[in-house]
């Protein structure tokens, strides 16, 4: 792909999260002659405004692209090594872009947390993607990079120390400070709407191995109601991102020829503390809708709020001798916005540069 005009094209650059990706790219790679990138969207005026607001140089072109116009999508795709798209819900706006990337052998990264659509796209395009060399990477934000890579890092360490992987890993969110993404709420709404038309989608949503290329592993520990974690001596509550994160962790295991083993179990919950207070907190979290107050798509928290956010996730490998090995993944800034924009940008750079 050496004849491509760009390393990365950011599609959705005028949306709230898209602007944060552009801001990060400008700060990190704006003066890097080794990285060529462009921004894309439907409105020329909005693209110009984003460039002016974020002081993006004239060396970053603007591409006019509409997700419903296959010709404009194909033109964008053929100019770049990787398409980074923040335009969701992906089940409504993502299929054409992904398909064109597959056809033309171009890498693709997104922020998708919609397992039904991901399952559909994998079934439809995986074989052709292998033929053309397109690398399609879903969920390159807070869902699911810290969780997927946290499990990977921990299992590699377990294997290095003990010669075999842990058959059970527990993901435990210790802290998460930040507002939920409006895009996440919109994606959930679109998925619920799809359930009315496709009742069979429910089986995909509840199957932890739905993205594992047909593999079906052992029964997984329940994570849908509060429980007491005996080893950590704390109450834990359901974590609303677990349904997509667990599927992506199991998919990675399958894609790596079951590096973690075919008997691998993984669940993910939110630490609430010990005692009666911890139990009450876990029950409260388990009964609430965490996305009820999420901003509308295209909106988001203030810069001060984003900068003051953070997250901290603990991963616990339960070993055959009864001991445990822990690893942690933490990050500064709001996980759903600033950290996510950094993750997806670096995912794209990783694909084209490493």
Predicted feature descriptions by range:
Residues 64-82, 86-92:
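Conserved Rossmann-fold cofactor-binding substructure of NAD(P)-dependent oxidoreductases
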Residues 6-28:
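N-terminal Rossmann NAD(P)H-binding glycine-rich loop of SDR-like oxidoreductase domains
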Residues 89, 100-118:
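ADP-ribose/adenylate-binding Rossmann-like module
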Residues 30-46:
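Conserved glycine-rich Rossmann-like NAD(P)H-binding loop of the short-chain dehydrogenase/reductase
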Residues 24-34, 256-258:
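A short, Lys/Arg-enriched amphipathic alpha-helix followed by its capping loop at the start of a domain
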Residues 50-58:
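Short, conserved SAM-binding/catalytic segment
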Residues 112-134:
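Rossmann-fold NAD(P)-binding glycine/threonine-rich loop
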Residues 131, 156-354:
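C-terminal catalytic/substrate-binding lobe primarily of soluble NAD(P)-dependent oxidoreductases
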